[in-house]
């Protein structure tokens, strides 16, 4: 079936927002196989988001980690890193969570205010060491 990847991507996001997580996941996995270059960083990020929403934090860590490894300079870089830290935090893995939040602020000083503020809030909540 020859469907525009952008439409498929938009549909996957709509499914995610409608809390149809399994369907969203299927769409994103299918899209990832097609590898539309311009969409790959976003597809990878949203794969992490679906697993995060399903509270499958181990899988979310793998997806956000892959996004960071493959697309560190994409617009989703800081979001990947924030959600990676939150995933570790949800698994009560304070050390890794703290390291990710600290690294986020060093690696992405120009990240959106929301991302930076959330990272700082999480670091304070976890009582992370200062450096």
What are these model-predicted stretches?
Residues 1-14, 18:
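Acidic, proline-/serine-/threonine-rich low-complexity intrinsically disordered segments
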Residues 33-39, 70-76, 106-117:
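Short solvent-exposed coil/turn linkers within tandem alpha-helical repeat scaffolds
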